[in-house]
């Protein structure tokens, strides 16, 4: 995932994600677990997108989006029970089959071992970031604030490089304070 957000409807989610990075979405894929409304479709229409995935598109959304050339709309059952519980990866000379990691445990205040205790909003951002970072590949770092990703760093030889990328993106979005950072592993030094 490049940019993600949490909000009560697709329009608000899309607005928050788009405001975080207006460049990376170009030619991208939008996936949501809520119905795409006409209002959300009108926001997405001017953006070059390859695919929009959602459990449903309302009639107004279809009217708006079906006029776009080369855009594929996919209605997908987003319930966890609809997902194949196995993951298949092709490897040289074979096939790796493993259980799909669909569970994400929530971070709770009693897990916090620092002297400074996070506010409720920071706990929400920690859980949001934790749910996103598990889908980012290799030395993953996600920077979050107010229920949206502001920076994503991945694919670097070390997490410090990924963190630098993610923080640079957050700063480019104009946010420099109150950030929450989620990582898929440990840093090579004490925080």
Regions found by a protein language model. Name each.
Residues 5, 140-147:
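Short beta-strand scaffold segments in enzyme catalytic cores
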Residues 74-123:
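Long, charged amphipathic helices and adjacent flexible linkers at domain junctions
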Residues 156, 162-191:
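Generic long, charged, amphipathic alpha-helical segments
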């Amino acid at each position: 995932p490049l940019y993600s957000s949490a909000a009560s409807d697709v329009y608000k989610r899309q607005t928050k994600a788009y405001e975080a990075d207006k460049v990376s979405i170009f030619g991208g894929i939008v996936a949501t677990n809520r119905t795409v409304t006409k209002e959300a479709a009108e926001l997405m229409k001017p953006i070059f997108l390859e695919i929009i995935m959602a459990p449903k598109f309302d009639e107004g959304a279809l009217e708006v989006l079906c006029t776009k050339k080369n855009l594929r709309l996919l209605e997908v059952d987003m319930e966890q029970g609809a997902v194949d519980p196995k993951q298949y990866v092709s490897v040289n000379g074979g096939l790796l089959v493993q259980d799909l990691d669909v569970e994400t445990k929530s971070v709770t205040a009693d897990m916090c071992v620092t002297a400074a205790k996070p506010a409720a909003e920071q706990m929400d951002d920690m859980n949001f970031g934790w749910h996103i970072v598990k889908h980012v590949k290799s030395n993953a770092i996600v920077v979050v604030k107010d229920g949206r990703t502001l920076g994503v760093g991945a694919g670097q030889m070390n997490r410090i490089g990924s963190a630098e990328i993610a923080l640079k993106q957050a700063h480019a979005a104009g946010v420099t304070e109150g950030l929450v950072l989620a990582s898929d592993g440990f840093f090579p030094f004490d925080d």
